[in-house]
A protein has these predicted regions:
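Mature N-terminal segment immediately following signal peptide/propeptide cleavage
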Residues: 27-56
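Bacterial N-terminal signal peptides
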Residues: 9-20
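An aromatic/glycine/proline-enriched structural segment found at the starts
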Residues: 183, 191, 220-287, 452-456
């Protein structure tokens, strides 16, 4: 097939052009990006340290793409993909055959559904990569959607729903807080969906959803490990190349539809085993784009929170857990998510302490620390920790595949990895102070959530 040429960050790149030039992330220098004629992305990261590969097929569809009345369909479809597929290139899959064949060769496989993507992935010996690619091409071609199999999988999903959602008041309350922070109704439902919705799904519903979204031009094959780009491209062309590009529905990402409502809420439930509290603030928009400048701001926020909370010597840990001994754990995060930006503080108090009182003291310490104790030395230490973590992840079989899958999920420019080390190194103390000022000076009034066990 004819190779396409793309312009990325002002550099003309072809199918065999290096994506990452950072010496600290040497393995990312092996990353190659191809696009088949039908629009399917193929990303390959070479790592010949061990004769193994991590491969995943990522579809750009998730819970945010579901229609009202069908909440949970992306997750149910993920389950049903392993329950039989019609023949493609002369071969189909029986129920359980996908997992069975991967298990037979010693592979470990799984699948996951998120707000933005659905992924199918496996870790295996590199000599078995074609089997994974071949079977995932069969999955892309279609599913049997047998009604009896569907009813069985609904039962499995219902058990998950009861464990993760219905019988988990902490998860429900936390999800509601995050949905309120985002401000758009599309975030209100959990990824697993609602019982009345997923139990009402039909085989035709799943077939229609698959036909809409499981298209080559809405998918990426990502392979990391003991492979060559040329070999992976040949396998991708062999098994995925005959699919025509499809008409994929427009993905609508919701803007905030409602104002953030500050306030205080207490959730008391017999299923809550220990008290905790969290407090959240809506922040003004920092960056809406998904390119390198957005990554710079996000890494500034990440470095800021790491300076405060990472490690046993972290100021937050030392003050709340060692000096005051009032919390078992505590955390603070700032999330910059394309205009839906927020901060959250959470504490788990020691037994006998009031969770909200501990939360108040944690906030007082946080504000004082952000205003007075940000230093160049602390920033540089966290930069080194962050870079070390990225290097260690890059030197694993699955780490690079996960990194590129995250870019697919966020629809970010693949070029952000061209200058990743420079982006992190270039974060200044002023950048970090600017993020801190968002919280200290421009945040909304907070919303506080207290979770308490039901007293007998």
């Amino acid at each position: 097939m004819k190779r396409r040429i793309f312009t990325l960050s002002g550099i003309l790149i072809g199918a065999l052009t290096t994506l990452v030039s950072s010496p600290a992330l040497a393995l990312y220098e092996q990353a190659r990006w191809f696009t088949l004629d039908n629009g399917m992305d193929v990303i390959v990261i070479e790592n010949h340290r061990a004769p193994a590969v991590h491969a995943r097929v990522v579809y750009k569809v998730g819970a945010l793409d579901e229609a009202p009345g069908q909440f949970g369909i992306a997750h149910v479809l993920e389950h049903m993909m392993f329950r039989g597929s019609p023949a493609y290139h002369g071969r189909g899959l029986l129920p359980g055959q996908y997992d069975g064949e991967l298990g037979r060769i010693g592979a470990t496989d799984n699948a996951s559904t998120s707000a933005n993507v659905t992924s199918y992935y496996a870790l295996m010996g590199s000599e078995h990569l074609e089997l994974f690619i071949e079977m995932n091409a069969i999955l892309m071609n279609g599913l049997t959607a047998d009604s009896d199999q569907l009813e069985n999988e609904k039962g499995v999903v219902l058990q998950e729903f009861r464990q993760r959602w219905e019988n988990n008041p902490t998860a429900r309350a936390s999800h509601a807080m995050r949905a309120a922070l985002r401000g758009a109704s599309a975030y209100d439902h959990p990824i697993i969906g609602y019982e009345e919705d997923f139990l009402g799904l039909t085989s035709q519903d799943l077939l229609d959803f698959h036909a809409d979204w499981y298209q080559p031009n809405n998918a990426a094959l990502i392979v990391s490990g003991d492979v060559t780009p040329e070999d992976v491209l040949a396998l991708a062309r062999k098994h995925f190349g005959d699919f025509p590009a499809g008409d994929v529905p427009e993905r609508i990402r919701p803007d905030a539809e409602r104002a953030f409502e500050p306030g205080f809420e207490t959730v008391t439930d017999a299923l809550i085993t220990k008290a905790s509290a969290r407090r959240a603030w809506r922040l003004p928009e920092v960056v809406a784009e998904t390119g390198p400048e957005a990554f710079r701001s996000r890494y500034a926020a990440r470095l800021l929170t790491s300076m405060l909370t990472s490690g046993l010597d972290a100021p937050f840990t030392r003050y709340l857990q060692t000096e005051r001994q009032i919390a078992l754990s505590a955390g603070f995060s700032i999330v910059l998510d394309e205009g839906q930006d927020w901060a959250m503080l959470n504490v788990d108090p020691v037994e006998g302490m009031d969770a909200v009182e501990v939360l108040d003291e944690a906030e007082d310490f946080l504000r004082n620390w952000l205003a007075n104790d940000l230093t160049e030395d602390r920033l540089n230490r966290q930069k080194r920790r962050l870079m070390n973590g990225l290097v260690y992840a890059a030197d694993s079989v699955d780490g690079p595949a996960g990194s590129f899958a995250s870019l697919v999920a966020s629809q970010s420019d693949y070029g952000v990895y061209l200058t990743l080390e420079d982006t992190i190194a270039g974060v200044t103390l002023d950048d970090v102070r600017e993020i801190a000022a968002l919280f200290l000076e421009q945040a909304s009034q907070p919303r506080t959530l207290a979770l308490e066990p039901l007293e007998e």
